[in-house]
A protein has these predicted regions:
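C-terminal amphipathic alpha-helix
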Residues: 24-53, 104-155
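Long, amphipathic, charge-rich alpha-helical segments that form helical bundles/coiled-coils
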Residues: 64-130
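N-terminal, post-signal-peptide region of Sec/Tat-exported proteins
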Residues: 40-79
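Extended non-catalytic scaffold regions that mediate assembly and binding
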Residues: 5-6, 10, 45, 49, ...
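Classical Sec-dependent N-terminal signal peptides that target proteins to the secretory pathway
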Residues: 1-22
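Short, charge/polar-rich alpha-helical segments
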Residues: 23-33, 61-68, 98
Length: 155
Protein backbone atom coordinates (compact mmCIF):
# COMPACT_ATOMS: atom_id res chain seq x y z
CA UNK A 1 0.00 0.00 0.00
CA UNK A 2 2.82 2.39 0.87
CA UNK A 3 4.41 1.60 -2.45
CA UNK A 4 1.24 2.74 -4.25
CA UNK A 5 1.23 6.11 -2.51
CA UNK A 6 4.91 6.60 -3.21
CA UNK A 7 4.41 5.65 -6.84
CA UNK A 8 1.42 7.98 -7.15
CA UNK A 9 3.36 10.86 -5.58
CA UNK A 10 6.29 10.34 -7.93
CA UNK A 11 3.95 10.12 -10.89
CA UNK A 12 2.32 13.43 -9.97
CA UNK A 13 5.72 15.08 -9.51
CA UNK A 14 6.91 13.88 -12.92
CA UNK A 15 3.69 14.51 -14.85
CA UNK A 16 2.98 18.06 -13.60
CA UNK A 17 6.16 19.63 -15.04
CA UNK A 18 5.56 17.87 -18.35
CA UNK A 19 2.06 19.28 -18.47
CA UNK A 20 3.38 22.78 -17.76
CA UNK A 21 6.05 22.44 -20.45
CA UNK A 22 3.48 21.40 -23.03
CA UNK A 23 1.34 24.41 -22.17
CA UNK A 24 4.24 26.87 -22.28
CA UNK A 25 5.52 25.40 -25.55
CA UNK A 26 2.07 25.77 -27.05
CA UNK A 27 1.84 29.35 -25.81
CA UNK A 28 5.29 30.19 -27.20
CA UNK A 29 4.50 28.54 -30.55
CA UNK A 30 1.19 30.37 -30.85
CA UNK A 31 2.83 33.74 -30.19
CA UNK A 32 5.65 32.97 -32.62
CA UNK A 33 3.19 32.12 -35.40
CA UNK A 34 1.14 35.20 -34.55
CA UNK A 35 4.22 37.38 -35.07
CA UNK A 36 5.10 35.60 -38.32
CA UNK A 37 1.53 35.93 -39.65
CA UNK A 38 1.35 39.58 -38.64
CA UNK A 39 4.66 40.21 -40.38
CA UNK A 40 3.34 38.59 -43.58
CA UNK A 41 0.14 40.64 -43.45
CA UNK A 42 2.16 43.81 -42.84
CA UNK A 43 4.40 43.11 -45.83
CA UNK A 44 1.33 42.43 -47.97
CA UNK A 45 -0.33 45.69 -46.93
CA UNK A 46 2.96 47.54 -47.40
CA UNK A 47 3.40 46.25 -50.94
CA UNK A 48 -0.22 47.06 -51.80
CA UNK A 49 0.03 50.58 -50.40
CA UNK A 50 3.14 51.28 -52.42
CA UNK A 51 1.56 49.96 -55.59
CA UNK A 52 1.36 52.47 -58.46
CA UNK A 53 -2.08 51.08 -59.37
CA UNK A 54 -3.82 52.48 -56.30
CA UNK A 55 -5.15 55.94 -56.98
CA UNK A 56 -8.32 55.88 -54.91
CA UNK A 57 -8.19 57.68 -51.55
CA UNK A 58 -10.66 55.24 -49.98
CA UNK A 59 -8.35 52.31 -50.74
CA UNK A 60 -5.52 54.08 -48.94
CA UNK A 61 -7.70 54.66 -45.90
CA UNK A 62 -8.78 50.99 -45.95
CA UNK A 63 -5.14 49.91 -45.92
CA UNK A 64 -4.35 52.34 -43.10
CA UNK A 65 -7.29 50.96 -41.12
CA UNK A 66 -5.96 47.45 -41.75
CA UNK A 67 -2.57 48.52 -40.38
CA UNK A 68 -4.22 49.91 -37.24
CA UNK A 69 -6.17 46.68 -36.74
CA UNK A 70 -3.06 44.60 -37.33
CA UNK A 71 -1.07 46.56 -34.75
CA UNK A 72 -3.95 46.45 -32.27
CA UNK A 73 -4.39 42.69 -32.64
CA UNK A 74 -0.66 42.14 -32.19
CA UNK A 75 -0.67 44.18 -28.98
CA UNK A 76 -3.67 42.23 -27.66
CA UNK A 77 -1.93 38.91 -28.42
CA UNK A 78 1.22 40.14 -26.66
CA UNK A 79 -0.78 41.05 -23.57
CA UNK A 80 -2.54 37.67 -23.64
CA UNK A 81 0.86 35.98 -23.77
CA UNK A 82 1.78 37.50 -20.42
CA UNK A 83 -1.63 36.83 -18.91
CA UNK A 84 -1.39 33.17 -19.91
CA UNK A 85 2.01 32.58 -18.27
CA UNK A 86 1.18 34.04 -14.86
CA UNK A 87 0.67 30.69 -13.11
CA UNK A 88 3.22 28.66 -15.07
CA UNK A 89 6.60 27.77 -13.64
CA UNK A 90 9.06 28.96 -16.31
CA UNK A 91 12.54 27.70 -17.03
CA UNK A 92 15.36 30.05 -18.02
CA UNK A 93 14.99 28.93 -21.62
CA UNK A 94 11.26 29.71 -21.59
CA UNK A 95 11.94 33.15 -20.15
CA UNK A 96 14.51 33.79 -22.88
CA UNK A 97 12.07 32.79 -25.66
CA UNK A 98 9.26 34.85 -24.16
CA UNK A 99 11.59 37.84 -23.92
CA UNK A 100 12.57 37.42 -27.59
CA UNK A 101 8.92 37.12 -28.62
CA UNK A 102 8.06 40.20 -26.60
CA UNK A 103 10.90 42.21 -28.17
CA UNK A 104 9.96 41.11 -31.70
CA UNK A 105 6.31 41.84 -31.04
CA UNK A 106 7.05 45.35 -29.76
CA UNK A 107 9.40 45.99 -32.67
CA UNK A 108 6.85 44.83 -35.24
CA UNK A 109 4.18 46.93 -33.51
CA UNK A 110 6.43 50.01 -33.75
CA UNK A 111 7.28 49.33 -37.39
CA UNK A 112 3.62 48.92 -38.34
CA UNK A 113 2.71 52.14 -36.52
CA UNK A 114 5.64 54.03 -38.09
CA UNK A 115 4.65 52.92 -41.56
CA UNK A 116 1.02 53.86 -40.89
CA UNK A 117 2.06 57.27 -39.56
CA UNK A 118 4.18 57.95 -42.65
CA UNK A 119 1.33 57.15 -45.03
CA UNK A 120 -1.26 58.91 -42.90
CA UNK A 121 0.88 62.07 -42.91
CA UNK A 122 1.41 61.67 -46.64
CA UNK A 123 -2.33 61.35 -47.33
CA UNK A 124 -3.31 64.27 -45.11
CA UNK A 125 -0.75 66.53 -46.76
CA UNK A 126 -1.10 65.16 -50.30
CA UNK A 127 -3.09 68.19 -51.41
CA UNK A 128 -0.90 70.74 -49.65
CA UNK A 129 2.85 70.83 -49.94
CA UNK A 130 3.59 70.70 -46.20
CA UNK A 131 4.90 67.13 -46.37
CA UNK A 132 7.57 67.23 -49.02
CA UNK A 133 8.79 64.32 -51.07
CA UNK A 134 12.15 64.78 -49.38
CA UNK A 135 10.61 64.39 -45.91
CA UNK A 136 8.66 61.35 -47.12
CA UNK A 137 11.90 59.84 -48.43
CA UNK A 138 13.69 60.47 -45.14
CA UNK A 139 10.85 58.89 -43.16
CA UNK A 140 10.79 55.82 -45.39
CA UNK A 141 14.57 55.54 -45.22
CA UNK A 142 14.52 55.56 -41.42
CA UNK A 143 11.74 52.93 -41.43
CA UNK A 144 13.74 50.68 -43.75
CA UNK A 145 16.82 51.13 -41.56
CA UNK A 146 14.77 50.12 -38.54
CA UNK A 147 13.53 47.01 -40.34
CA UNK A 148 17.04 46.01 -41.39
CA UNK A 149 18.79 46.96 -38.15
CA UNK A 150 16.79 44.60 -36.03
CA UNK A 151 16.58 41.87 -38.68
CA UNK A 152 12.88 41.51 -37.94
CA UNK A 153 12.19 40.00 -41.29
CA UNK A 154 14.42 36.98 -40.73
CA UNK A 155 11.81 35.33 -38.46
Amino acid sequence: MKFSYLYLTLLIIWVEPLKANVDINEIIDNMYYEIVNTKKKYLSIKSNLRSPYINNYSLYTNYLDSLRLLAGNLEIKRQKLFLSIIDIDLSDEDIYFINELNNNSILLFNIINSFGRIYDTYLINMISSEYSLEQYSLDMESLLRLEKKYSLFKL
